[in-house]
């Protein structure tokens, strides 16, 4: 018996009319031989599991794979012109900004520079503050050497030439001479014109020639004992002057204690104790510093009289809070009864 799957394959195969008419007599034999030759029971039982390797024929040869690989894929070949166009279309990204490395600088030296970098982005490449040697500091106060006259003349002529070359293309108006200001008309590359007014006389005073500062002079050494004596004398003079200007007044209170005793006979005995002078505190200090010192003294005395404060645990705090809450509820509940008792 022929399997049903083989019959479907034979029925689906296309047949030309010429070949079918010529081989009409040999059709049964050819069909039987074709069916028998194409039918292989072992081929139906084989099953290839999915893998990344390409399929290979049953006999183990790799001719089909070699032939398949040798055939060029249609539509994959591209001309070099297309590749060039694609490369040209890709946008060219500008190089990213880079900062010089600071690995050679210690972290302690970069602390101040990092603080300034928080407010403004800067590239730190050296220590801050920069170390200055004594020689470079002394060069600031050294007088410059005299230059030759030829060098001075060449420098001045070059400066005049640099100033006259851009001013030659500028146009000056005659109306500005009366006002004392000079008008310069500038023409920008884009074709627009703008006028600039400035006064040479007022600007000349802002640009002064450089003059080196005088060299520093050492401070004269003074004896400490003499300085202390002068300071104490000045303080004594100030105290005496203030005492003369504002007379100092003090108020004292005298408290007399009288003790009265009674004997068994009914006689009274009176004894007076000697008074004690007590300065009156009613006089308020006049200056702000005196009042501030008095308040500080009173604060310290009150703080010492309060005693020591002891901390309690969280459990006791919660317990006290619950007691207060219960007491409030009790008072709220017995409010009417208490009011009635007060009325009676």
Curated annotation (Swiss-Prot):
Residues 1-27, 43-101, 325-344 are annotated as: Disordered. SMART domains: DUF1713 (SM01155). GO terms for cellular component: mitochondrion. Residues 51-74 have a biased composition (Low complexity). Residues 325-338 have a biased composition (Basic residues). Keywords: Mitochondrion. It comes from the Eukaryota. It is found in: Mitochondrion. GO terms for biological process: positive regulation of proteolysis. InterPro entries: Ribosomal_mS38_C. Pfam families: COX24_C. Component of the mitochondrial small ribosomal subunit (mt-SSU). Mature N.crassa 74S mitochondrial ribosomes consist of a small (37S) and a large (54S) subunit. The 37S small subunit contains a 16S ribosomal RNA (16S mt-rRNA) and 32 different proteins. The 54S large subunit contains a 23S rRNA (23S mt-rRNA) and 42 different proteins. PANTHER family: AURORA KINASE A-INTERACTING PROTEIN, SMALL RIBOSOMAL SUBUNIT PROTEIN MS38. Belongs to the mitochondrion-specific ribosomal protein mS38 family. Component of the mitochondrial ribosome (mitoribosome), a dedicated translation machinery responsible for the synthesis of mitochondrial genome-encoded proteins, including at least some of the essential transmembrane subunits of the mitochondrial respiratory chain. The mitoribosomes are attached to the mitochondrial inner membrane and translation products are cotranslationally integrated into the membrane. This is Small ribosomal subunit protein mS38. It comes from Neurospora crassa (strain ATCC 24698 / 74-OR23-1A / CBS 708.71 / DSM 1257 / FGSC 987). The gene is cox24.
